[in-house]
UniProtKB/Swiss-Prot annotation:
It holds the Pfam family Ribosomal_L30. GO terms for cellular component: cytosol; cytosolic large ribosomal subunit; cytosolic ribosome. It comes from the Eukaryota. GO terms for molecular function: mRNA binding; structural constituent of ribosome. Keywords: Ribonucleoprotein, Ribosomal protein. CDD domains: Ribosomal_L7_archeal_euk. This is Large ribosomal subunit protein uL30w.
Amino acid sequence: MTEAESKTVVPESVLKKRKREEEWALAKKQELEAAKKQNAEKRKLIFNRAKQYSKEYQEKERELIQLKREAKLKGGFYVDPEAKLLFIIRIRGINAIDPKTKKILQLLRLRQIFNGVFLKVNKATINMLRRVEPYVTYGYPNLKSVKELIYKRGFGKLNHQRTALTDNSIVDQGLGKHGIICVEDLIHEIMTVGPHFKEANNFLWPFQLKAPLGGMKKKRNHYVEGGDAGNRENFINELVRRMN
């Protein structure tokens, strides 16, 4: 028997299979390396954005302090610019509620007592709030409230499912196409009522708050009358602390 005949002949089908497996392994390796690189770049981008937002918030706070100081020196007082963002909490149930009011509460996504949602201030939302005012309380949330609500009680809507915001990938999946890829992006979009506020707000599931520590005073009375309903302006932040 010659040397050539003694060598094992590998079938062509086996060679093709081996080649396919090697190509698949190489492609998988390249895919993993690309994903690793992409994740590293995304983490860097998220870090830089968070840093940028923090700087932006601090500058805004310093500017506000300076404006108040200047107004005081001139013998006047500083008037806050008109708010763009509201936080609304439903404080009453369904007893003796008329169909139109019930419908508006549903449109506002306030289906249960102690549900809370963000709203952009405009003529339409103000008109709706006036209609349901005996059943809700609302005001102007500050950065601390927005952050604490989203980080502590935030759930997103993914495939019509209520999904906890456990990491940035949840936000990226839901809002990445709008350039909102992390929780800090989401907070910034809500707080500044940005160009994609509607999408960001619809992504957020209504907040389910707890009954306030110390309870409610008089749900049927307006806030300015010593009750709980209606506009409490900046004092909504104190209520958020008690219910979060």
